[in-house]
Amino acid sequence: MVVQTEPDVNSMLEEKVQYAKDLIADTIKKYPCVGVACSFGKDSMVTVHVARQVDPSIKIFAVMTQFKPPETLEYLRKMNDLWDLNTTVYMVADKVPDILNSKTLTVRLLPTDEFKTKSAETEKKYRDKIYTVVPDECCRILKVEPTKLAVANLDAWICGLRNTEGRTRVDYQYVEDKGGLIKVNPILTFTETDVWKYIALNGIPSHPWYGQGYRSLGCAPCSHPGGILERDGRWIGTSKCGGECGIHTQKLK
């Protein structure tokens, strides 16, 4: 049996990081308009950190929802200011959350009519919340449609997807052509251990929910701690359990 030593593990991580940098550099060179999607989870923060070493001024965008926990919005504000990210936030909401009222953030509010109508219809028919009964529809309105706006003027977008996160991500590739929109996954082969090692080595502050046992962060009602795979805690008790919100499975252009 071959046992990897600490230097071996560190060397492997260094190689993965360098590959990620090279891939991002190639993407920026090849495509005129590139942006980084950031959920402000651990994988996104590693991706943003790596990308900004290649291009400190690269565009950062985030899609937030009314169901994101306050800790996520607070962490977004904290990291945006700490790293001077100038993040553009897309959000289906009537007003900007107080914590996101900042000159260093651009918040694009999107119409709420469809979500309010669908929510009311669902609660009237099923006596339950839209995210419980029809989570795909909830995610479509609050996440997928805003993401379409976020990438509308991009030639390529960079994501923090990893193929060991869950059952739905094992077949992703480093570079994917999604109907004319290029998606790049530079940390695709990072393990969960790689991510936390990178965070520790680079002194990156982490979202407080990770300290409570969460391994994958989303909206508060649809995220739970624990799980064999990282995404097992997402959408528990629904047809989407451990699955995807839709932004990586649906055509965005």
Where are these regions (language model features)?
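Nucleotide-activated chemistry modules centered on ATP-dependent adenylation/adenylyltransferase
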Residues: 2-253
